[in-house]
Regions:
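Regulatory inter-domain linker segments that are low-complexity and enriched
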Residues: 1-6, 88-117
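Forkhead-associated
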Residues: 5-8, 12-87
Length: 117
């Protein structure tokens, strides 16, 4: 399961768990993730869960969505990807990847050559 951390000018505004197959994002109040800013279209983008993967898709917004500084129409999100919409940054955090790098990875790590076995 993943989450988005939404920030503006480096200040975290909200954190949203991605739990639905489709999560809408836009300026209008009926969206699942509301960003009240004129640079954000009323119905700007949708996050889609496909199995364990999360994709973001632009819904023909005026200002687009950017991932890794490139304007994209549809993009698979990886842990740590930064999505830019207007002046807002949305950081995608994949909790599976974080667990894999943490507890599981440490438990199965091979000792370094300079460590005593």
């Amino acid at each position: 399961m993943g989450k988005l951390v939404v920030s503006l000018d480096g200040v975290v505004i909200k954190e949203v768990q991605i739990t639905k197959d489709k999560t809408t994002l836009g300026r209008r109040p009926y969206n699942d993730i509301v960003i009240d800013n004129l640079a954000v279209s009323g119905e700007h983008a949708v996050l889609q869960m496909v199995g364990q993967d999360v994709f973001i898709e632009d819904l023909n917004s005026t200002n687009g969505i950017y991932v890794k500084s490139k304007r994209v129409r549809r993009q698979h999100l990886n842990d740590g990807d930064v999505v830019v919409i207007g002046k807002h940054e949305l950081i995608y955090m994949d909790e599976r990847a974080r667990f894999g790098r943490g507890h599981f990875a440490e438990a199965h790590a091979q000792p370094r050559p300079d460590e005593d076995a």
